Amino acid sequence: MSSFLTLVLGGARSGKSRYGEGLIAALPPPWTYVATAEALAAEMAERIAAHRARRGSNWRTIEAPRDLAAALAKCETTPILVDCLTLWLSNHMLADADIELETARLEDALTAAKTPIVLIANEVGSGIVPDHPLGRKFRDLQGVLNQRMAARADRVVLVVAGLPLALKGSL
């Protein structure tokens, strides 16, 4: 199985995770779901539970709120869905981590991967300008991260209202 990188972008509740799951599920199982969310609040715990229930038994879940590079290295042969880069970035920001270093580590892991990977990320640059400096910094860093991932991806898909639009490559 060769490496093929897909980036799936979209707004909140756009259907991007479901679309990404479908891309991975079209490949032979088993599949690996790399989760970057942490259930720090009841609402997030409910969202995580809903995602798990939707996936089924062919999925193995790896929790990787920050060390995504190490998680990808553990998945040598199974197709991988990473959901999502947006939470991964915010986790690093809240930990006051070196974002450039962590992004470079992620890029190295993607380069070394030998299996198909689907990355999920929010497209946050189309909304209003955040009024708080941290919000603006997050929006800017997410935009740069999305650009870097899109540059290396074989395929980039934007999902709006559950409908995929190919930005790079084909559906």
Model-predicted regions and their roles:
Residues 54-102:
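Helix-adjacent hinge/juxtasegments
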Residues 31, 80, 155-158:
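Short, well-ordered beta-strand core segments
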Residues 27, 57-58, 78, 113, ...:
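Structured helix-beta-strand junction loops
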